[in-house]
Amino acid sequence: MTIKNEEQQQQTNKLKYPKNLLSSGLDGEGNTYINIEDLWKKELEGKDNKMEDKWYKSADEYWKGVEATVDGMLGGLAQVSPIDVVASKVFIQDFIKGTDSRPPINLNLALDCGAGIGRVAKEFLLPIGFKNVDLVEQNKLFLDKAKSDNFKDDNRVENYYAVGLQDFTFEKKYDCIWIQWVIGHLHDLDFIEFLKKCMDSLTPNGIICIKDNCAKKRFIMDKEDNSVSRTEDHLKYLFDQAGCKLLKSMVQPNFPKELFPVLMFALERK
């Protein structure tokens, strides 16, 4: 484990969470955490950062057991994919067309984060007009599936980065960095650091878009895939800590009622 990660672990526990984020949370087994600080203390603190290693390894092991299909990527809910894509297209239109206060983004290169088998790139990012897309996904088998199936005869995907977001090193500038259903696998400080790296890797007028589950009243820890669903206020706090300006937010419509609410956020540097 690097010195940087040692420092990050210390800082994670020193985030000054506002009082409204210090309510209790739950895991999928019904266990209660006193607050978000208690979650990170139990999940991350340990000698030589071994607990932080375990945090990411547990998620990695979970996804190694998931089928490399759309149904696998969406937890057995492949039927929501078209609904998801339609809403994402609506959400990003203001940024593609531009507004009185903001010129349109360029459509040269997008980054699909937590890309899986490339569903978002294939069904959304490329169809809306991006000339090229890079994929970053920790599971190499998913990327191999993307290469052999989704993009077999499509050279618009330039790079396939097999690495977790917490370890990803940006090599390019992007017009749009799209981060969907993956931030729950990053602990708070790594999420903040990743957003900072994203901002440093945007082209002029580029945007970061986040689409993910939002817990309604308090955070929920999923012990099965080792991820945390944060409240909207929690996410906005982390955006602020990273130095991000919120440009737009939108609730995903028409999803099954039994699912977590899904929100979309567009960000730029403050």
Curated annotation (Swiss-Prot):
SUPFAM superfamilies recorded: S-adenosyl-L-methionine-dependent methyltransferases
Keywords assigned: Methyltransferase, S-adenosyl-L-methionine, Transferase
Any one Gene Ontology BP term: methylation
GO molecular function: methyltransferase activity; N-terminal protein N-methyltransferase activity
Record carries keyword Signal: no
EC id: 2.1.1.244
One GO CC term, this protein: cytoplasm
Binding site for S-adenosyl-L-methionine: G114, R119, E137, Q138, N139, L165, Q166, Q180
Pfam families associated with the record: Methyltransf_PK (PF05891)
Catalytic reactions on record: N-terminal L-alanyl-L-prolyl-L-lysyl-[protein] + 3 S-adenosyl-L-methionine = N-terminal N,N,N-trimethyl-L-alanyl-L-prolyl-L-lysyl-[protein] + 3 S-adenosyl-L-homocysteine + 3 H(+); N-terminal L-seryl-L-prolyl-L-lysyl-[protein] + 3 S-adenosyl-L-methionine = N-terminal N,N,N-trimethyl-L-seryl-L-prolyl-L-lysyl-[protein] + 3 S-adenosyl-L-homocysteine + 3 H(+); N-terminal L-prolyl-L-prolyl-L-lysyl-[protein] + 2 S-adenosyl-L-methionine = N-terminal N,N-dimethyl-L-prolyl-L-prolyl-L-lysyl-[protein] + 2 S-adenosyl-L-homocysteine + 2 H(+)
Alphabetized PANTHER family for the sequence: AD-003 - RELATED, ALPHA N-TERMINAL PROTEIN METHYLTRANSFERASE 1
Homology family: Belongs to the methyltransferase superfamily. NTM1 family.
Function: Alpha-N-methyltransferase that methylates the N-terminus of target proteins containing the N-terminal motif [Ala/Pro/Ser]-Pro-Lys when the initiator Met is cleaved. Specifically catalyzes mono-, di- or tri-methylation of exposed alpha-amino group of Ala or Ser residue in the [Ala/Ser]-Pro-Lys motif and mono- or di-methylation of Pro in the Pro-Pro-Lys motif.
Protein name: Alpha N-terminal protein methyltransferase 1
The species this protein was found in: Dictyostelium discoideum (Social amoeba)
